[in-house]
Design a protein with these regions (language model features):
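Secreted/extracellular ectodomain signature
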Residues: 1-108
Length: 108
């Protein structure tokens, strides 16, 4: 599961780069949230895919506020682009991958 978790962190960084942002350059306290399509997660997605909706926050006073702000951004982007079949979840807090991978996830 840790390998999948770390790959989700890479997908988040790749998605940020797609939108011309560098998560590593954002000031802490920072959070990255992504709308994760658990039913579509496979090796190809983990190696080259991007999330269709994300949210992020940075330079926040408190972690819980950073999480809430990033989560709202993800949900707003998902609504705007009419993304469905995914769940907005925390992927990164500062530089630590915090994604919670379902125990029944099978990737091919």
């Amino acid at each position: 599961m840790d390998q999948i978790k770390n790959k989700l962190g890479e997908v988040f960084h790749r998605t940020m780069a797609h939108w011309n942002f560098d998560y590593n350059k954002l000031d802490e306290t920072k959070v990255g949230v992504a709308c994760i399509p658990w039913n579509d997660i496979d090796r190809a997605f983990l190696e080259g895919g991007i999330f269709e909706a994300i949210g992020f926050s940075y330079s926040m006073a408190k972690e819980d506020f950073a999480i809430r702000t990033a989560h709202q951004g993800c949900e707003q982007m998902a609504r705007h682009y009419e993304v469905s079949d995914c769940t907005c979840q925390v992927v990164l807090i500062d530089n630590e991958v915090r994604a919670e991978v379902p125990t029944d996830l099978i990737t091919d």
